[in-house]
Every structure is written in structure tokens, then in C-alpha cells.
Amino acid sequence: MNAHAALTLYTDGACLGNPGPGGWAFALVPSDVPFLETGQXAPEAAAFTRSGSAYPSTNNRMELCAVINALQEAHGRAAEAVVVVTDSQYVRKGITQWIHTWKHNGWKTAAKQPVKNKDLWEALSALADALSVEWRWVKGHAGDPYNELCDRLATDAARRAAQSTADCP
């Protein structure tokens, strides 16, 4: 991965009820920002952040919206390589393992059921295919500074979701 082009994108989604009001957030951390230890508070000024909401939604749709919006931002910055850090195994395994089978099976699961959130998976796949992406999983609510920042921003967005317009389908 080209260190000069690499951005680290932390993402998170939240839903108050499932389904219910949902929020998503990402933090874009340039490669020149110093590493933060577990438990340190991530200064919002050290990262570019964005959040949005949808109502009604689900936690999985919000996780996907967070990554889609983060990758759109990376594309807008002409990034060639990114690291995506998510606490969602659904997103990480979906994009690195399951999606290949879904596409091969005509967007059906191994159980022959339609893939949920196909619209978002297709959007994510197109964005990810245009970049060099390294996918990392981090345990949620375990003190990772930027994961905690995204969690807070996504939860705040979910709280506002009932009064706002949707930022992601």
C-alpha cells in the first residue's frame, strides 16, 4: 500500500431499535496523524468527520452507509489506497468473503434467499473495486479512540434521525 496515498477510514453505524432511527459516521484520519493509544480520546480536529441518518433503518444499513460515505470521500480526495476500520463483521466479511458468492449466485445467499441490502452492497462493491482497500476489524466499545468517536457521532445522528431527512437510502 502506498503510504503517501493511504488514508485510514474509521466507520460506524447505530440504530435505536432495529429497525428504527439510524445514524452513520466516519472519521478520515490522514497517515500523518499520530497514533492514539486505546482509551485516549480522539480529538475531532485530528480527523475529518461526517455523519448522517435515515429513518427507518437498520443497524446493518447504517454500517454500510458509513463505509460507502467514507469511500466516497476518499474518492473525492483522489486516494489510491485506504484502510477501512470497522467494528462490523457483517461489513468486513460481507465485502471480503460473502459478496463473491452472492454475485456468483445472482445475489442470493447460500440458503437461496435474496441478499439483504443488495442496493448498498452493490454501491460498496463499486467503490471498493476502484481503490486498494485493506479491511480491518476492531472490537466495538473497547476503547479504540476513533471507533469511539464514530460510535458517538453515529449515535447522535440516530437520535436526530426522526427529525431529519435521510442521508442514505
Curated annotation (Swiss-Prot):
It catalyses: Endonucleolytic cleavage to 5'-phosphomonoester. It is found in: Cytoplasm. Mg(2+) 1 binds at D12, E63, D87. The keyword Cytoplasm applies. Mg(2+) 2 binds at D12, D151. It comes from the Bacteria. Binds 1 Mg(2+) ion per subunit. May bind a second metal ion at a regulatory site, or after substrate binding. Keywords: Cytoplasm, Endonuclease, Hydrolase, Magnesium, Metal-binding, Nuclease. GO terms for biological process: DNA replication, removal of RNA primer. One of its GO terms (molecular function) is nucleic acid binding. Its cofactor is Mg(2+). Its EC number is 3.1.26.4. Its main location: cytoplasm. Residues 3-159 form the RNase H type-1 domain. GO terms for cellular component: cytoplasm. Monomer. Endonuclease that specifically degrades the RNA of RNA-DNA hybrids. NCBIfam families: PRK00203.1. Belongs to the RNase H family. This is Ribonuclease H. It comes from Treponema pallidum (strain Nichols).
